[in-house]
Amino acid sequence: MLTNIAKKIFGSRNDRLLKQYRKSVARINALEEQMQALSDADLQAKTAEFKQRLADGQTLDGILPEAFAVCREASRRTLGMRHFDVQLIGGMVLHDGKIAEMRTGEGKTLVATLAVYLNALAGKGVHVVTVNDYLASRDAGIMEPLYNFLGLTVGVIISDMQPFDRQNAYAADITYGTNNEFGFDYLRDNMVTDQYDKVQRELNFAVVDEVDSILIDEARTPLIISGQADDNIQLYQIMNTVPPHLVRQETEEGEGDYWVDEKAHQVILSEAGHEHAEQILTQMGLLAENDSLYSAANIALMHHLMAALRAHSLFHKDQHYVIQDGEIVIVDEFTGRLMSGRRWSEGLHQAVEAKEGVEIKRENQTLASITFQNYFRLYTKLSGMTGTADTEAFEFQSIYNLETVIIPTNRPVQRKDFNDQIFRSAEEKFEAVVKDIEECHKRGQPVLVGTTSIENSELVSHLLQKAGLPHNVLNAKEHEREALIVAQAGKVGAITVATNMAGRGTDIVLGGNLKHQTDAIRADETLSDEEKQAQIAALEDGWQAEHDKVMEAGGLHIIGTERHESRRIDNQLRGRSGRQGDPGSSRFYLSFEDPLLRLFALDRAAAILNRLAPERGVAIEHNLLTRQIEGAQRKVEGRNFDMRKQVLEYDDVANEQRKVIYSQRNEILTSKDISDLMQEIRSDVVSDLVDTYMPPDSMEEQWDIPTLENRLAAEFRLHEDIQSWLKADNAIDGQDIKERLIERIENEYAAKTELVGKQAMADFERNVMLQVIDNQWREHLAAMDYLRQGIHLRSYAQKNPKQEYKREAFTMFQDLWNGIKFHIASLLTSVQIEQNPVAVVEEQPIGNIQSIHSESPDMEELLGQSQTDLVTEAFNPDGTDFSPEALEARGQIVHRNDPCPCGSGLKYKQCHGKLA
C-alpha cells in the first residue's frame, strides 16, 4: 500500500525516466528547424564534425541532441520517415544501454537508427542483432540509404557467407546479423591459427531486436561448434527397439518401467525399469550376464538408452521436429520456425533419427561453446527492443543488468481484449474458433489465428477447408512465404493461421501492405514504366477503399487457440492488432485438454468447471478462471527462469575458464615473440616432473630416479644419468637437478632454433601451442559435459551439486593447464627438426555455423609435411607460376586473403602464396 501511495506522489521509476528523456526531446525538437535549413552537403558534413568533436574529448552524451536531430532530418530526406517524439525517447533508452519496450507498429527499426548512428560515430563498430537472416538483410537494406547519406558504411552477416566477406561486413561502421551468426563468429575467431583470419572487431555496442526472444527464449540453448566424433551408429538402431518393450507409468508412483515428467521434460527410469532394461540388453548380447548398466564400462549403453527413451516419449513429429528431405529438422518451440542445421546434442538427434527411420548421422563432439547469456555480456554496452519485455523485466535486470523502460505509444491503443473462453474439450474449442472466424469473414474483418504447434495449425487449416473458408497457413513448413503472407494478413476478410507470431518482424497493415505490392510491380521487368505507374495508381486507390472497409469491420481480430507457457508470447500475438491506434480485438480459446491447463491449473480449474457444469459447446468466461490460468503461466515462467538461471550458474564456471583459455590463445596469436613464454613453460614442466619423483622435503630413499630418467628420455628425448650425478656429488638436491636439466634442455633447444632460424621456430612454436590448446580444450569440454550430467547425484550424498561442480571444475582446469604445458614442452623439445622443416599450419576451414563443423587438424597432421605440393599438383597440372613475382609480371594483383588464382578454392596465403 505504501508503495502505491509513493508511486502516486512521486511517480514510478518508469515515469521519472520518461520525464528526464522528454527534456532531451525538447532540446532535439528545438534543433529541427536549424537542421531543415541545412543543405544536403552541410547535413552530411555533420558526421565528420561529430567525429572530430569526439576526438577532441567530447562525449557521446554531449553530442546526443545534435546527432539525433541530424539523424531525424537525414531520415526524413532519404527514407521519407520522420522520428516521432516517442521514437526519440526509444533511441535514448537504447543509447543508455537499456531495453525499450515498444508496441508493435511503433517503428522499432527506425528507433534503432538514432542510437546506432550516435554510437557508430565512435568508430568502434555497432552490431544490430535480429532473429533471422531475412530480417537482417531487410532492415539493413531499408536503412542503408540513411546511413550512407550520413557517411557511414553498413555490412550484413548472413549464414553461408565466406570469411573474407565477413571481415568486410564487420569492418563496416554498422553490422546487421543474427544472434547465431555473431555468437558463432566469436567462437570461430577463437579457433583460428592466424590472427588475420579473425573476422570480428571488439564487441563494442549491440542493439538486439526482439531482445526477449534472443536473451530469454534462447538462453537455455548454448551455441556449439562441433565436429563428428567416433560413434557406433548401429547402437542407436538397436537401442531404438528397446523403448517399445518398456512400460510407461501413468503416475510417478505407479507400476511400470519409466515415468515421463512433462513439466521438467525428463524421463526417469524406475528400479524395475532398470532391471527390465538390463534383461532386454542382456538378451540382445549388449550386456554381459549379471552386469549392471551403472558400471563404468556401460556408461555409453545407459547414455544411448536414455536418449532412445527421450526420443520416444518427449519428442513428437510436427511439434518438436519435422522430416524434410530425409532429415530431422528441429522446430523452434517459441517461433515455430524450422531451425535447419541445428542438431540436438547428447545423442538425442541420432535417437530421433533412429525412431523415424531416416539416415543416422554421427554424434558431435564439442569444439567450442558459449551461451547467449555469456556472449552478449561480453559487449561493452548492450541494449534491446521488443514489444513485450515488462513481464521479464526482473530477469533482464538480474541476469544482464538491463533496465526495461516502457515507451508510450504514439497514439492510444484501441484494441479490445476479450476474456478467455474455456471449453471442456479441444474439439469444442476448435468448433468455436471456426465459428468466430466464419463470423469475422462474413463482415470482412481480417483474422489472425495463433497456434502453438504445426500440428494444431494444420488441424485448424483442415477445419477451415471443411467450412469452405479460404485461408493462408504460416508455419515452419511455409518459411519462404511468411513475410508475404504476414504483409497481406490485414486485407478484407483475410484469414491467416500462424504457428507462432513471435519474431515475425513484419507489420500487419489494415487493408494489406501496399509497399510489398508496389515493390513487386516495380521489380517486374516485363512491364513498361507507364504500365507500372498505372498499376500502382490503381492499387493505391483500391487500397484506401480496402483500408476503410477493414476499419469499419473492427480492424484485425486475433484468435489464440491456446495459452502459451509465457504471458509474453501471448502478448506478442495480441500485439499484432491495434498498431498505431488502429481498431482491433483479441480473444483466446482454451480447453481443459490444453497442456498448460492439464499440467499446471487442472485441479482448481476442474473444480470450477464442475460447479458451473455448462452444456457441450458452451464456453465458460470467469475472472477467477482467467486469474487461475495467469497464475499457472507465472508458475511456468518462474520455473523457466530458475532453469535459465541454473544454466547460467553452471556455464559461468566454464565461462571463466573459457576467458582464460581464449585470452592465452589470443596472446599467443598476436605476440611476435613467444620465446619467453616457451622458456617459462619448459622450466615449469621440468620442475613439476622432478618434484613428482623427487618430492621436496623428502628423504633420498623416497626418490624414484629410474622412472624420472625414463620419463625424461621418453617425453623430452633427454638421456641423462641422474643417478651418476647423485653418486658424484652427495650434496646435490632436487633444485640442483632441476637447474641442470633445464640448462641441458635450453641448450638443445637453442641449437634447434639456430638450425632452422628464429622466425621459422617461432611460427612452429605458435602453431604447436595453438593446436595443443585446442585439442586439450576440446577434451576438457567433453569432460565438463560429463561432469555436468552426473553432478546432480551428489545431492544424494547431502552435498551441494553447484559447489561440487565448481570445486571439481577448478581441479579439472588446473589439470588442463598443466596438461597443456606438458604437451607443448614435450612436443617441442622431442620433435626432430630438419633444416627448413616447417610450413605454417593453416586453420582448417570451418563450415556453416549451423552444420556439423570439421575438427581441427590433429597433432600428426600438425607435425607432418605441408600439403601445398598436393594442392599445386591437383590444381596446377601444367606448372603455371603463381608466385608473387610472376603474378606481378603478368599484371595480376592478388592479396594474401584473396582466392588463389590456380582455382584450388584456398586463400592465396594458404596455397601458392605459401610457397613464396
Curated annotation (Swiss-Prot):
Belongs to the SecA family. It is found in: Cell inner membrane; Cytoplasm. It is an enzyme of class 7 (translocase). ATP binds at Q87, G105, E106, G107, K108, T109, D507. Keywords: ATP-binding, Cell inner membrane, Cell membrane, Cytoplasm, Membrane, Metal-binding, Nucleotide-binding, Protein transport, Translocase, Translocation, Transport, Zinc. Its main location: membrane. InterPro entries: Helicase_ATP-bd, Helicase_C-like, P-loop_NTPase, SEC_C_motif, SecA, SecA_CS, SecA_DEAD, SecA_motor_DEAD. The gene is secA. It catalyses: ATP + H2O + cellular proteinSide 1 = ADP + phosphate + cellular proteinSide 2. May bind 1 zinc ion per subunit. Its cofactor is Zn(2+). Its EC number is 7.4.2.8. GO terms for molecular function: ATP binding; metal ion binding; protein-exporting ATPase activity. The keyword Protein biosynthesis does not apply. Monomer and homodimer. Part of the essential Sec protein translocation apparatus which comprises SecA, SecYEG and auxiliary proteins SecDF-YajC and YidC. It is a peripheral membrane protein. GO terms for biological process: intracellular protein transmembrane transport; protein import; protein targeting; protein transport by the Sec complex. This is Protein translocase subunit SecA. The lineage of its organism: Bacteria, Pseudomonadati, Pseudomonadota, Betaproteobacteria, Neisseriales.
